[in-house]
Amino acid sequence: MIDDTLLEAEEKMDKAVSVAKDDFANIRTGRITPAVFGKVLVDYYGAPTPVQQLASFHIPEPRMVIITPYDKSSLGAVEKAVRDSDLGVNPSNDGTIIRCVFPELSEQRRRDLVKVARTKAEEARVSIRNIRRHAKDAIDRIVRDGEAGEDEGRRGEKDLDEATHRYVSQVDELLRIKESDLLSV
């Protein structure tokens, strides 16, 4: 019983770290990756569709992305979605492709993005701690109901604390890497 609770908690913690990785990937650094377009949704035949499903991306320069829609009729919709997104870029359309030139990140904008990254990391840490709290409550309930002994309960809590520390450390490492990416010019 306790092992099942620990396994479920670790799976949820792993998911929290995965969400943090995705959040960090969507924060722009000095070099552009297609991941910055991850949250951009295009109104495609009435359905919000991620731009990454509608187009290919080519990065000829560190600050330029060329978007080539698979369906040429969606060119205008893709351009509009990119323009309306919070990426801070003005796409140009030449009839077959869309060019997006990203401005150089100012020092202030870099600091703002570091704050955003720290906020995302803290959200992940809180999520991991909440998972720990729920798992600890479940372990306490198992011990209280007599389904496991107190020694087994303490061992389970110790394992849970180790897992919590391990996953929080992963989030901290992801944050450290993202901060160094953002602050390197």
From Swiss-Prot:
GO terms for molecular function: ribosomal large subunit binding. The keyword Iron does not apply. Its main location: cytoplasm. It is found in: Cytoplasm. Keywords: Cytoplasm, Protein biosynthesis. Gene3D superfamilies: 3.30.1360.40, Ribosome-recycling factor (1.10.132.20). One of its GO terms (biological process) is translational termination. It holds the Pfam family RRF. It comes from the Bacteria. One of its GO terms (cellular component) is cytoplasm. InterPro entries: Ribosome_recyc_fac, Ribosome_recyc_fac_dom, RRF_sf. The keyword Transmembrane helix does not apply. HAMAP family: RRF. Belongs to the RRF family. NCBIfam families: frr. Responsible for the release of ribosomes from messenger RNA at the termination of protein biosynthesis. May increase the efficiency of translation by recycling ribosomes from one round of translation to another. This is Ribosome-recycling factor. It comes from Parafrankia sp. (strain EAN1pec). The lineage of its organism: Bacteria, Bacillati, Actinomycetota, Actinomycetes, Frankiales.
